[in-house]
Amino acid sequence: VNCREMEARVWSDPQVLEILRNDYVIVALYSDDKKVLPESEWVTTDSGKVLKSLGKINSYYALKTFGVNAQPYYVLQGRDGKLLVPPRGYDLSIPGFVAFLRSGLEAYHNRQ
């Protein structure tokens, strides 16, 4: 619900949309997707549990990669997969989200 609210109330802002469309590649990991994947795409967790749905696999990936399974959780990464700036969670502040995106761009350009 919070992810959809962020998309509807923050991402829909013209300034945010322009930055997202022009300056970022968006990868969304939906944890509520119940689609069962083909067996060749199932994931076995460290504890031996087999994850079959896209949502469960996405949740596991987020937890293993970022140490967090909170939704929404925005991560800005460079091409090397390293964080550009600290991640951001649920916050409906449009100016805050714009600043977050711009800080990621600045960090990216400073690394080049």
For each of these PLM feature ranges, what is it?
Residues 1-4, 74:
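The canonical Cys-X-X-Cys-His
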Residues 8-12, 45-54, 61-111:
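Non-catalytic, surface beta->alpha helical segment in thiol-disulfide oxidoreductase systems
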